């Protein structure tokens, strides 16, 4: 007797805890603890909320709020800067402070000069729309409230009344207005992101701060309007809420509005009309809206580079995609304020190095350290007791490295990078163990240094960064989904120190941190222009400020690639407030629309025409040239790096005073086209900058980015090809099984969003026991108690007869999948539904079914909005989407089941890019409702317990599975298991069944049922007792029960789930495609499978095999029970799975999709895990 094991409930509890964590995901924007140390590709995931970054592994706290993971290798924040809670500082008049500000030490954007010209924003109001704020932080302070726009609460109330605003509160002199527009009545869970953003824009910490340096925002003397907006009732409602906040900010006198949040890859065209009107309203009133570009890098997320065949890999979404906004990318400057440590080098020189700490080391104390390799083995730590362990990054998680060091007696850990020029990474907190991350260069210095001591300094300093000046790898690329140029400009967004909740300070990274700096600069520049250009209207000053700011930005250069970073990544370049403030010239496109040039489709040769504007009273002599570049390709993927092609020669031009003049630069890239098309067959970008200097020996004065596409950008394919067409069985998000390339397992216990990401048709496999219950009149499947599960599978896939844990594509002779359905209402292969991996945003998706004459017999409802599947790292960003409206149940437009035959299932959609034409993808689908005919009699031998049927089944479609099912009670759960046929076609019936607790249950003959299923999902089943009764010589009784005298039903009903027919090579001859034996004359020609060929080949020919190399339905263990205790453990689980069909996400409402996904993960995971453990145990025991 095989001994069975009890369920591992300890593991089940852990799994449930994990599920609970996932569902309670509320990102808190502070530094996410890094838990992984495995290198990953340099991308990120955007959530529809504020854009701070979690820069190593995605945290379970990222589903809802601000942070968005960076490229799995970088740091989010520096908790070492946290302060203990303090009483908020007074917001009234305070003497000028003498403590140095962070900007005094490091000002890469050169803001101080502009601050002086514009009085640091005194007398102005700025608005921040975000997820939450700490209204009591010490940084909310005015130096002189007599210069404030709103002198009192009464002044605010008067302004509110003038504009019909009946809500919002006065907080203090600094925070003139606060209101929660989310209308959810809850206190904001996340207060940190908005607090951090507001500090960058307008923080003004007092000199009494415990920080070594004082926080001062770009506009420290401006008053704040804090407006909380969070997703509560869907994205559309969310957009309407922040639209109302925009209108109120404008009416309350805001000079600039910062919006550091976004919905990746969403198109501006899909925003509600009231949101678009709010943007237009702000523009008309001269109010600048500054948005963050997002932290999603590009199509593919943090683990995958975009394919070189699909150049539309930009993911900048809304609201950043709006033309009227100023959209900001993130870059890391060459110097950074950082914690430091000092070592004595071999020549006795002090060497300072930047460190990023988690749980700080004691300052000014000399620590001994010892090298511990990669911190994996016990031997690595033989010398670390009482010392700091110096460990190289790689191989295992940071958490494990730190835990191993602690176990070995180390007093702390230093982990150094395994990559040159990498960004710093915050390490996880492991039992409060002091730990710090350092660069590879410094780590190697420590390793080789003979003096193994290090001292951590108390005061942070400005030191060069290991990465140098570089675009942040998480920063989202353009173009937008609409095909427009974004981002507009770049600003520092890497490890930015600012205010966070509870009167603390921390470093965060993300485009959320870049945007408020630019917002502050825009506010200061507009205030300067009020004096400089008093005759201009506010909207004219806004337009000029945006163009000047972009023109005066410095195009960032990639020293590694010897080329400028792409305009699709950096926009016009790094913001430079000093240059903007002093600028008397700027450059725009030829129509003076904006300071960027979008050429759309171009050929090998084209021209770039720009307009140079001179607002000074003197003529200006300039030199200009253009850089020409494209994308670098690495194998089959874009490297997300620039590739320089050439530069034009410098030319000279003179611009008259107070005038403008056009400049045209001819570009000829024809000599590169052959090689570039070989790497990027569907086209490539030709882009760069037109740069201007006043003197060839001096720095760039101004520049303008241009972008063209060599090809037809609008008509690039929107949908990835179906998985059925893949030569190696893989897709962008799906790795093929190396042993069986056509293996496509169904959803099973693992929710599909976590694995099956490709383009295909789905259907549903309903187990025999459920079908039987339905046929016997059970109307509500929730009332069915069964060990089996209704499972979503892929049309054209079938399981092995003895193992339904894996599904494989079964193909016609022409290579197309055998996608067949039987729409008879039994829930087994009754429908097909479209699932797609979209490479681009599309609109007006509709499915239709055509008969063989090309007539449309059915059309689905329209899905108006389709968002590209840009990432599959989290449940909130899927690698594919299932479209519920495309579900076809085999009926025509009048609701009648169509005739048996082959139909074309067509999915039509149109990319949203300008000039795009409609595209479509076709699938062949067989409809067949013909019920299998089975034997009406059988014999049973009590000697060897073999059941022999009188004849083989006759089917219209090939036989998928021929089995004996038996059902018994395992405790209180009805349990079904199956017996596959022996090689001679007989079945060996067991005398007893084993329970999960190791006991046995005796089986009666009435427990057995003969079940036949064809590849369209038609099922016939007959009790074995009826088969025995049908035999002329009644069989010997088995002692368990009497054979009933009722005759078997002639034509039982059907079902299906999918696989090649059960063929027995040694039994000659077997049935042909008609389901009849070859020696019997068929009444008509064999029915065909829709491909024009007879479905079933004769058994004497070699059986078809799937990609696993096995014949579908072949039974390795002769006549043994196939213990397929399927995946359902209770009626509740079955009901959950059934209802899940109507909850699968579509692209209509992404935040709703997220809620659906989270709920489904929890509900299906628990019940599925229980049943999965049952099934796994049984299958292992069967194989023993």
UniProtKB/Swiss-Prot annotation:
Reaction equation(s) it catalyzes: The primary cleavage site is at 67-His-|-Lys-68 in human C5a with a minor secondary cleavage site at 58-Ala-|-Ser-59
UniProt protein name: C5a peptidase
Domain Peptidase S8 intervals: 99-581
Entry comment on modification after translation: Cleaved by SpeB protease; leading to its degradation. Degradation by SpeB is probably strictly regulated to preserve integrity of C5a peptidase.
Purpose: This virulence factor of S.pyogenes specifically cleaves the human serum chemotaxin C5a at '68-Lys-|-Asp-69' bond near its C-terminus, destroying its ability to serve as a chemoattractant.
Biased composition (Basic and acidic residues): 1029-1054, 1061-1071, 1078-1088, 1095-1107
InterPro entries: C5a/SBT2-like_Fn3, C5a_Peptidase, Ig-like_fold, LPXTG_anchor, PA_dom_sf, PA_domain, Peptidase_S8/S53_dom, Peptidase_S8/S53_dom_sf
Regions crossing the membrane: none
Its EC number(s): 3.4.21.110
Keywords tagged on the record: Cell wall, Hydrolase, Peptidoglycan-anchor, Protease, Repeat, Secreted, Serine protease, Signal, Virulence
UniProt cross-references to Pfam families, sorted A to Z: CHU_C, fn3_5, PA, Peptidase_S8, ScpA_C
Organism: Streptococcus pyogenes serotype M6 (strain ATCC BAA-946 / MGAS10394)
């Amino acid at each position: 007797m095989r001994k069975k094991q009890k369920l591992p409930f300890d593991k089940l509890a852990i799994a449930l805890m994990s599920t609970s964590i996932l569902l309670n995901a509320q990102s808190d924007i502070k530094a996410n603890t890094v838990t992984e140390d495995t290198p990953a590709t340099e991308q990120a995931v955007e959530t529809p909320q504020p854009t701070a970054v979690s820069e190593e592994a995605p945290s379970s706290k990222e589903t809802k709020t601000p942070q968005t993971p960076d490229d799995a290798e970088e740091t989010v924040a520096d908790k070492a800067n946290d302060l203990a809670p303090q009483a908020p500082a007074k917001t009234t008049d305070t003497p000028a402070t003498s403590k140095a500000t962070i900007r005094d030490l490091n000002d890469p954007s050169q803001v101080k000069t502009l601050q002086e010209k514009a009085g640091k924003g005194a007398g102005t109001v700025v608005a921040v729309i975000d997820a939450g704020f700490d209204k009591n932080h010490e940084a909310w302070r005015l130096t002189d409230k007599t210069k404030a726009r709103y002198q009192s609460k009464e002044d605010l109330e008067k302004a509110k009344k003038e504009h019909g605003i009946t809500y919002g509160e006065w907080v203090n002199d600094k925070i003139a207005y606060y209101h929660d527009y989310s209308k959810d009545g809850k206190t904001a869970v996340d207060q940190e992101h908005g607090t951090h953003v507001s500090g960058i824009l307008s923080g003004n910490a007092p000199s009494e701060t415990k920080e070594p340096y004082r926080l001062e925002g770009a506009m420290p003397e401006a008053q704040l309007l804090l407006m909380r907006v969070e997703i509560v009732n869907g994205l559309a409602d969310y957009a309407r809420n922040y639209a109302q906040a925009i209108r109120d900010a404008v009416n309350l006198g805001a000079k600039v509005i910062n919006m550091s949040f976004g919905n990746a890859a969403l198109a501006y065209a899909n925003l509600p009309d009231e949101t678009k009107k709010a943007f237009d309203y702000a523009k008309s009133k001269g109010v600048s809206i500054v948005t963050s570009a997002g932290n999603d890098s590009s199509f593919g997320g943090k683990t995958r580079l975009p394919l070189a065949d699909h150049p539309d890999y930009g993911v900048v979404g809304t609201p950043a995609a709006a033309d009227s906004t100023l959209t900001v990318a993130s870059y890391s400057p060459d110097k950074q304020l950082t914690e430091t440590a000092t070592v004595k080098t071999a020549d006795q020189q002090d060497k300072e190095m930047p460190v990023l700490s988690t749980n700080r080391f004691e300052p000014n104390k000399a620590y001994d350290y010892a090298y511990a390799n990669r911190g994996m083995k016990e031997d690595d730590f033989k010398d670390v007791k009482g010392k700091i362990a110096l460990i190289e990054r790689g191989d295992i998680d940071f958490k494990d490295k730190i835990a191993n060091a602690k176990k070995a007696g180390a007093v702390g850990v230093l982990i150094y990078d395994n990559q040159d020029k990498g960004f710093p990474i915050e390490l996880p907190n492991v039992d409060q163990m002091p730990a710090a991350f350092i660069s590879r260069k410094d780590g190697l210095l420590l390793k080789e240094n003979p003096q193994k001591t290090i001292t951590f300094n108390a005061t942070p300093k400005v030191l060069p960064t290991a990465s140098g000046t570089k675009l942040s790898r998480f920063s989202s690329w353009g173009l937008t989904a609409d095909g427009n140029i974004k981002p507009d400009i770049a600003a520092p967004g890497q490890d930015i120190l600012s205010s966070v909740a509870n009167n603390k300070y921390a470093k965060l990274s993300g485009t959320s941190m870049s945007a408020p700096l630019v917002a502050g600069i825009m506010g200061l520049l507009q205030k300067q222009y009020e004096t400089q250009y008093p005759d201009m209207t506010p909207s004219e000053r806004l337009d000029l400020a945006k163009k000047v700011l972009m023109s005066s930005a410095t195009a960032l250069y990639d020293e590694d690639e010897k080329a400028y970073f792409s305009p699709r990544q950096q926009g016009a370049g790094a913001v430079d407030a000093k240059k903007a403030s002093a600028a008397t010239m700027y450059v725009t496109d030829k129509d003076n629309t904006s300071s960027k040039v979008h050429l759309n489709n171009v050929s090998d040769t084209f021209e770039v025409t720009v307009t140079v504007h001179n607002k000074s009273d003197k003529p200006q002599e300039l030199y200009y040239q253009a850089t020409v570049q494209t994308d670098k390709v690495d194998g089959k993927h874009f490297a997300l790096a620039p590739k320089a092609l050439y530069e034009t020669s410098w030319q000279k031009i003179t611009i008259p005073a107070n005038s403008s003049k056009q400049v045209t630069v001819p570009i000829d890239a024809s000599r590169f086209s052959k090689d570039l098309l070989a790497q990027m067959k569907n086209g490539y970008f030709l882009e760069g900058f037109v740069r201007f200097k006043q003197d060839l020996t001096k720095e760039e004065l101004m520049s303008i980015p241009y972008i063209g596409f060599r090809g037809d950008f609008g008509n690039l394919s929107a949908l990835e090809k179906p998985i059925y067409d893949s030569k190696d069985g893989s897709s962008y998000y799906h790795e093929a099984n190396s042993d069986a390339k056509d293996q496509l397992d169904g959803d099973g216990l693992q929710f599909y969003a976590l694995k099956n990401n490709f383009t295909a048709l789905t259907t549903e496999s309903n187990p025999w026991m459920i079908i039987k219950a339905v046929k016997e009149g059970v109307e509500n499947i929730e009332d069915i108690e069964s060990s089996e599960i209704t499972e979503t599978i892929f049309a054209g896939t079938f399981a092995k007869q003895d193992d339904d844990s894996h599904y494989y594509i079964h193909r016609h002779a022409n290579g197309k999948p055998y996608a067949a359905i039987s729409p008879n209402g039994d829930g087994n292969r009754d429908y097909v539904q479209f699932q797609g991996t979209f490479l681009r945003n599309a609109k007006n998706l509709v499915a239709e079914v055509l008969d063989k004459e090309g007539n449309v017999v059915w059309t689905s409802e329209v899905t108006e909005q389709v968002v590209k599947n840009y990432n599959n790292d989290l449940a909130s960003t899927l690698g594919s989407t299932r479209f519920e409206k495309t579900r076809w149940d085999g009926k025509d437009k009048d609701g009648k089941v169509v005739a048996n035959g082959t139909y074309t299932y067509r999915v039509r959609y149109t990319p949203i890019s300008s000039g795009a034409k409609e595209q479509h993808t076709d699938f062949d689908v067989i409809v067949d409702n013909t019920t299998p005919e089975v034997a009406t009699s059988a014999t049973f031998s009590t000697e060897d317990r073999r059941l022999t049927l009188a004849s083989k089944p006759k089917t219209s479609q090939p036989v998928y599975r021929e089995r004996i099912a038996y059902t018994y009670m395992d405790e209180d759960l009805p349990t079904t298991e199956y017996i596959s046929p022996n090689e001679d076609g007989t079945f060996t019936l067991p005398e007893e069944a084993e329970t999960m607790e190791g006991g046995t249950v005796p089986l009666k003959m009435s427990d057995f049922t003969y079940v036949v299923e064809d590849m369209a999902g038609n099922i016939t089943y007959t009790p074995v007792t009826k088969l025995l009764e049908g035999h002329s010589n009644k069989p010997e009784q088995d002692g368990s029960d009497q054979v009933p005298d009722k005759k078997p039903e002639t034509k039982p009903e059907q079902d299906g789930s999918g696989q090649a027919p059960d063929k027995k090579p040694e039994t000659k001859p077997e049935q042909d495609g008609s389901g009849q034996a070859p020696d019997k004359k068929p009444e008509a020609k064999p029915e065909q499978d829709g491909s024009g060929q007879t479905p079933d080949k004769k058994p004497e020919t070699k059986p078809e095999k799937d990609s696993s190399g096995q014949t579908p339905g072949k039974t390795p263990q002769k006549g043994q029970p196939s213990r397929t205790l399927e995946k359902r453990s209770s009626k509740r689980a079955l009901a959950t799975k059934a209802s899940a069909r109507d909850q699968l996400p579509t692209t209509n409402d992404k935040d709703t999709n997220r809620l659906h996904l989270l709920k489904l993960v929890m509900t299906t995971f628990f019940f599925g895990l229980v049943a999965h453990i049952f099934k796994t145990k049984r299958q292992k025991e069967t194989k023993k």
